[in-house]
Amino acid sequence: MLEQVRIQKMVNGGYGLAHLSNGKVVLVEGAYPGEEVLIKTYREKRDFSFGKVVSLLKESEDRIKPPCRYFGRCGGCHWMDVKYETQLRYKKEVLIDLFERSNLKVEVEDVEPSDLVFHYRTKMEFHFQGRKLGLKKRNSDFVIDIKDCEVAPEGTGEILNTVKEAVQVLNVPVYNWETRKGVLKHLVIRYAFSTDQFMVIFVTKTESFPWGRDLVRAVLKRFPKIHSIIHVMNSKDSVVLRGPYKTLYGEGVIVEEFDWERFQIPPTAFFQSNYSITSKLIDHVYREQALQGNEVVLDLYAGIGTFSVRTSFSAARVISVESSRVAVKAGKANANINSRKNIEYVEQDVLDFLKNYSGRADRIILDPPRSGAGPEVMKEIARLSPERIVYVSCDPSTLVRDLKVLVENGYSIVRVKPFDMFPQTYHVETAVTLVKGDR
């Protein structure tokens, strides 16, 4: 069904919201507030539909020509065709809308902009498919073959094309996502901005990878400054960087440095995707704890210690809880590198840890995955009754869900500060500060 609609506002997920002639809500991808578009609805839900733009009838003044030749086909970026300042405004408006619909009365601050709006990513995951090497279409497993990427670090395109050529020359069997046969699945590129270190990661289904040595030679011949080359063995299709790994070349880690600390980042550990925003976020989380020097701090979903290290300079003790063995090992190493003796790492599921923890928790930091912490974790946090909580989230919808539990258990939201971790996309990082009792 074709219908002309006017986009009223942006909503979570990067969609433009409009109403059909029958009053039903329709979410339109690739359309912005004030635009009039001819759409075709393609998926029906009980309360709303999804629509695709067939024709743009009235264009927003905020539209620009995207610099990427793959934009609109590749699913990596969503808002590259609107001005950067407009992207920031949309992200703030989406957050305000979500908080209002959840009956959480807060003031959302302006989104902290990224120093780099292109070539800012610290990690890119590319996928092999037949003779293609690239990024997937949005909501699809179809891979768009690309030669460069506007958000990947400078130099990524050259590495990408060198690997693709070498894979074809060496006749490396590429993994087939339908038959689940073949070997080579992904190419991951990690980059440390402060030290100019590249890590190239080959992800395979199998442990055996006899082509690895020749691929290393091909990459190093053109890029002798590559810091590390890694082979990750991952038989699962759901997550890219998971499973045992071995170092084919180099040290096996890259190092990122900030004002007060430096971090070793291993191949499969999580680390934030934007260097400049991560630096600002570390500062923010540290300040928002208002530490006096005698506090015990729980850092939940601690990763490699991104927030733990800075916090440990002003807290009596930091207990860093993380379920990933690789991240825990790196976190302990990072505590040593930064001469922090008051950080204790616990390798355990966060909920299991909280259920059995009865010690002090004067402050709690949490930075859960996109799925959020969940109501059970939030109830356990409330039970421990910390004076201040700083919740860092990469998904606004799971954030407001979790915050409601804390508010219902006697906490007040005193600050909502968004950070633009992902320019050119609808994603937004948000740090929320809560205090026990009334603000």
UniProtKB/Swiss-Prot annotation:
GO terms for molecular function: 4 iron, 4 sulfur cluster binding; metal ion binding; rRNA (uridine-C5-)-methyltransferase activity. S-adenosyl-L-methionine binds at Q272, Y301, E322, D367. The active site is at C394. InterPro entries: MeTrfase_TrmA_AS, MeTrfase_TrmA_CS, NA-bd_OB-fold, SAM-dependent_MTases_sf, TRAM_dom, U5_MeTrfase_fam. [4Fe-4S] cluster binds at C68, C74, C77, C149. Its EC number is 2.1.1.-. CDD domains: AdoMet_MTases. Keywords: 4Fe-4S, Iron, Iron-sulfur, Metal-binding, Methyltransferase, S-adenosyl-L-methionine, Transferase. Pfam families: tRNA_U5-meth_tr (PF05958). Residues 1-55 form the TRAM domain. One of its GO terms (biological process) is rRNA base methylation. Belongs to the class I-like SAM-binding methyltransferase superfamily. RNA M5U methyltransferase family. NCBIfam families: rumA (TIGR00479). This is Uncharacterized RNA methyltransferase TM_1094. It comes from Thermotoga maritima (strain ATCC 43589 / DSM 3109 / JCM 10099 / NBRC 100826 / MSB8).
